[in-house]
Amino acid sequence: MSSLGRLHLITDARAGRNPLTVVQAALSVARTELVVQVRVADDATDRQAYDLARRVIALCARYDATCLVNDRLHVALAVGAAGGHVGADDLPVGAARAVLGSAAVLGVTARDADTAVEAVAAGASYLGVGPVHPTTSKEGLPPAIGVAGVGVVAAAVSVPVIAIGAVTAADVPVLRAAGAYGVAVIGALSHAADPAGATAALLEALTW
């Protein structure tokens, strides 16, 4: 998947800022290099997820950027997203691939080489690998695997590895050197005073 954008933005409604504002700011800078992953709180309704995803899809379409929906694959299908992303507690990878179809983008969370290899064999298009650093963006995460952990996974698979977990622009060079194709961020953009400027800094680091 060489055409996959290197910068992934995961939406965050907890930041006190409209996630659509952050998405628009990031898209205006990153354009096709941005992949927006629509993620809502566990207690959000499917209707809420659908409404947000539909609006994000409309924004992404203006820039020919990719939009995925995390966890709720039925919502991804309903809004016509490019695909989805599943974690350890979601549908098995093979089942997710069957739901989305062979042409869809399917991201899968993996934290070790064995899980990564199995995910790719079952149909993963790319892997979200981490957390690189301790993070509070999601409850119940395992300990951070660090840059070295990302490197172990990247060496084991041929699909793009997207590093995640409190990643900042300063982390990008060492993550890329370890084998990461790109990075996924939440707070680095959602909490930024200037999301467009923060996007530019991340892109500059990613395209060395």
UniProtKB/Swiss-Prot annotation:
Pathway: Cofactor biosynthesis; thiamine diphosphate biosynthesis; thiamine phosphate from 4-amino-2-methyl-5-diphosphomethylpyrimidine and 4-methyl-5-(2-phosphoethyl)-thiazole: step 1/1. GO terms for biological process: thiamine biosynthetic process; thiamine diphosphate biosynthetic process. Its cofactor is Mg(2+). The gene is thiE. Mg(2+) binds at residues 71, 90. 4-amino-2-methyl-5-(diphosphooxymethyl)pyrimidine binds at residues 37-39, 70, 109, 138. Its EC number is 2.5.1.3. Keywords: Magnesium, Metal-binding, Thiamine biosynthesis, Transferase. GO terms for molecular function: magnesium ion binding; thiamine-phosphate diphosphorylase activity. It catalyses: 2-[(2R,5Z)-2-carboxy-4-methylthiazol-5(2H)-ylidene]ethyl phosphate + 4-amino-2-methyl-5-(diphosphooxymethyl)pyrimidine + 2 H(+) = thiamine phosphate + CO2 + diphosphate; 2-(2-carboxy-4-methylthiazol-5-yl)ethyl phosphate + 4-amino-2-methyl-5-(diphosphooxymethyl)pyrimidine + 2 H(+) = thiamine phosphate + CO2 + diphosphate; 4-methyl-5-(2-phosphooxyethyl)-thiazole + 4-amino-2-methyl-5-(diphosphooxymethyl)pyrimidine + H(+) = thiamine phosphate + diphosphate. 2-[(2R,5Z)-2-carboxy-4-methylthiazol-5(2H)-ylidene]ethyl phosphate binds at residues 135-137, 166. InterPro entries: Aldolase_TIM, ThiamineP_synth_sf, ThiamineP_synth_TenI, TMP_synthase. The lineage of its organism: Bacteria, Bacillati, Actinomycetota, Actinomycetes, Micromonosporales. This is Thiamine-phosphate synthase. It comes from Salinispora tropica (strain ATCC BAA-916 / DSM 44818 / JCM 13857 / NBRC 105044 / CNB-440). CDD domains: TMP_TenI (cd00564). Belongs to the thiamine-phosphate synthase family. Disulfide bonds: none annotated. Signal peptide: none annotated. Binds 1 Mg(2+) ion per subunit. It is an enzyme of class 2 (transferase). Pfam families: TMP-TENI. GO terms for cellular component: cytoplasm. The keyword Isomerase does not apply.
